[in-house]
């Protein structure tokens, strides 16, 4: 099984979901074992719990891993991006058959989690540019994605008035030989 790192809309097709995650956040090394709902801080030879995703009744029991029957309602966390204020995560319900991807943002300060259908993507409420799916984040709290010109053209055909003026007017100059567009946003 694979998780697409380029877009949540096709969330499970490219990157293996059974791989552990290791990243640096605020000078701390974080680790999450595949199919596990806990993020650990690594210091020296010790691992301490940093964050646990409380999936409640949707928690995927370890004894059911590999079983296709009666597992469609369980949720598995498949990817995480961490900024100083947020945890952006991808979860998958129905790991083996009826797959339904979600993305979530956990606000570390307010202790609130926001969940949405991953097929919707994130939308820039300032420019109303096309929905996108973050592939990386910065220590400053920004999320970034690369958008292919073909996808932008498709979106512009369906939304012609949005790029006429303002911050998106540069999109009128792109063509099929243009470089991908890097989108950087801050929640």
Which stretches of residues belong to each language-model region?
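Short beta-strand elements that form the blades of beta-propeller/WD-repeat-like
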Residues: 23-33, 37-40, 75-97, 133-154, ...
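Short coil-to-beta transitions that initiate beta-strands within beta-rich domains
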Residues: 13-24, 68-72
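Beta-propeller blade signature
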Residues: 37, 101-112, 178-186
């Amino acid at each position: 099984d694979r998780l697409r790192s380029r877009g949540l809309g096709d969330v499970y097709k490219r990157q293996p979901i059974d791989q552990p995650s290791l990243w640096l956040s605020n000078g701390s090394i974080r680790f999450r074992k595949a199919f596990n709902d806990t993020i650990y801080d690594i210091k020296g030879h010790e691992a301490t719990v940093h964050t646990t995703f409380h999936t409640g009744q949707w928690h995927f029991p370890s004894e059911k891993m590999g079983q296709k029957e009666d597992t469609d309602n369980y949720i598995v966390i498949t990817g995480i991006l961490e900024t100083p204020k947020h945890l952006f995560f991808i979860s998958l319900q129905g790991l083996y058959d009826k797959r339904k991807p979600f993305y979530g943002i956990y606000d570390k300060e307010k202790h609130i989690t926001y969940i949405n259908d991953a097929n919707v993507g994130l939308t820039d409420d300032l420019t109303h540019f096309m929905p996108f799916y973050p592939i990386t984040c910065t220590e400053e709290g920004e999320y970034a994605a690369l958008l292919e010109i073909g996808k932008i053209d498709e979106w512009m055909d369906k939304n012609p008035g949005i790029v006429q003026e303002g911050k998106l007017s540069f999109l009128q100059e792109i063509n099929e030989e243009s470089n991908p567009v890097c989108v950087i946003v801050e929640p």
